[in-house]
């Protein structure tokens, strides 16, 4: 090995380390230069191993960052409506200088019929819609502007703003790719049926406060599903709509629970006694008075006096209340002995099971006759092996004593309570057998009104009088003397004349063809007697004339007016309208094309599909609701989104119109504090007077609104006297 070997190796090692250090130094300097001063051109010469930097804006990542930054700047500069949280194209300026978008202004004035300011609740007759977002309405002479809508009280700054606003108020087809605008609801429904084979929901059309193009078209199956279960399982599930409530008696759907309860109050009967009794379902409805009578006879106590039967609803929840009513209202029907015995009340109590109470009652000494004491002693001896306390044995002895007293007094017939089980309450009178015989004699001495009318009538035969019977068709209550057979009432003669007018009109339309007239009479009578459906009857009648579209509208209207059943009238008119839609020949005349309609749907599709926008509009249109706070500069309205979260969608009621979202408006409502669930623990109820009914739905079950709420118990912790208490609810 030569002596110069190690030195050469050291030199080579030093050279390699210098090259390495120079490379790292070049990299650091290049990085620092790129941070301090960006390269703006590709013409810069770079070393072979240097990093080539692209100019700003040419790299795809840099392009994305630049576009995002520009969008954020545009979003910050864009005006946001404080009601719907959407971008403002045209501003609606009120005389109080509060502002909103022109879409919300049209919703409030055209759909909700309100001219109040959303923020200060001041009513203004005239507002201004303009493109200028910073304009002061007091600097503009509204009377000189030619573009005005006097019906809505809106003044437009230019013609284009007026056209954009009027486009929202037209009868536009809701289909996404359709640009047809119709003249009215009939033409729009006809167009949807013929062109798209879809239908509108009539309940939503009548009650829903949205623009025409914001409605939803359904197929036949989809419309049935919409009424029954709502938007579950479809694209509109975010609205939380659970279907239109249905009246089980009439088999008819209604828009919401308020409409259903209104219908039940007007068309059906309600048991007011069940509303007062604790533990029973409140708001329990019955189809008619006959079914309510059967409920009274089965579960309650009815006064059988004639005047009370004629008055109706003279029913009591307990037998003691019935006896008190008889003593107060009908004392002449009792003898002195019966009055004295009726005022005696044998108490009956419901005791807790043995061992429920910790206190021991003193054993009562027996002062009854020998046979009673014997039975009591036997009962005590039978209970001695049960290891009961002295108080429990005394309690059972007392119950045995009360039962024996009732058995003894039952022979004299003046008990106020039937010892039979309470599950099968008697519906018979509380009188004794002897009293019932006396009552029969008095009915014969004082016959009912039906018997007197039958005796005075010369044409009607005499009918034996029966005891008063509680029925909606009872002669003792609803008897109306019928006119003599030889004379006709003016109402009957007028109705017969109207029938003859319909026959004469059809004879002219059919050229007095007897076969066609017979077919017409057969179709009408079959439909009236529930033998033929409305669609088949309409189809038969339309085949009898040459031009049914022009000739039969008046005929069907007259037939509908003559039908006694309003439901049948509605079915006939709906079948006639459906026939006209299905058999429309010239469907090209329905509606006109509008090129701006598709642009309107694309621009407003997000707002129209979200229930939160309708929630805010509903809240803003409320007359008695709190006014919205005016927007301040510290609030970043661009961050407010109109898309509901999953949690809010589950709690949103049908189609999102009954509850308003308060997250964007910093407001609270009573829906933020759901009601507590009903207690399931067994309680002792003392019926002293009337009790306030608990709200449930029409059919006695838990209402849908409470089932959709969060059932978690909400408590507020408070400190009192150094202890922490939980307040579950407040009264008053």
Curated annotation (Swiss-Prot):
It is found in: Cytoplasm. Residues 10-21 have a biased composition (Basic and acidic residues). The keyword Disulfide bond does not apply. This is E3 ubiquitin-protein ligase hel2. One of its GO terms (biological process) is rescue of stalled ribosome. The keyword Phosphoprotein applies. GO terms for molecular function: ribosome binding; ubiquitin protein ligase activity; zinc ion binding. It catalyses: S-ubiquitinyl-[E2 ubiquitin-conjugating enzyme]-L-cysteine + [acceptor protein]-L-lysine = [E2 ubiquitin-conjugating enzyme]-L-cysteine + N(6)-ubiquitinyl-[acceptor protein]-L-lysine. SMART domains: ZnF_C2H2 (SM00355). Residues 1-48, 345-380, 411-501, 623-732 are annotated as: Disordered. Residues 457-468, 701-713 have a biased composition (Low complexity). Belongs to the ZNF598/HEL2 family. The modification Phosphoserine is found at residue 482. CDD domains: RING-HC_ZNF598 (cd16615). One of its GO terms (cellular component) is cytosol. Pathway: Protein modification; protein ubiquitination. PANTHER family: E3 UBIQUITIN-PROTEIN LIGASE ZNF598, ZINC FINGER PROTEIN 598. A zinc finger (RING-type) spans 81-121. Residues 366-380, 415-433, 490-501, 629-654 have a biased composition (Polar residues). Keywords: Cytoplasm, LIM domain, Metal-binding, Phosphoprotein, Transferase, Zinc, Zinc-finger. It comes from Schizosaccharomyces pombe (strain 972 / ATCC 24843) (Fission yeast). E3 ubiquitin-protein ligase that plays a key role in the ribosome quality control (RQC), a pathway that takes place when a ribosome has stalled during translation, leading to degradation of nascent peptide chains. Activated when ribosomes are stalled within an mRNA following translation of prematurely polyadenylated mRNAs. Acts as a ribosome collision sensor: specifically recognizes and binds collided ribosome and ubiquitinates the 40S ribosomal proteins rps20/uS10 and rps3/uS3. Its EC number is 2.3.2.27. InterPro entries: RING-HC_ZNF598/Hel2, Znf-C2H2_ZNF598/Hel2, ZNF598/Hel2, Znf_C2H2_type, Znf_RING, Znf_RING/FYVE/PHD, Znf_RING_CS. Residues 245-315 form the LIM zinc-binding domain.
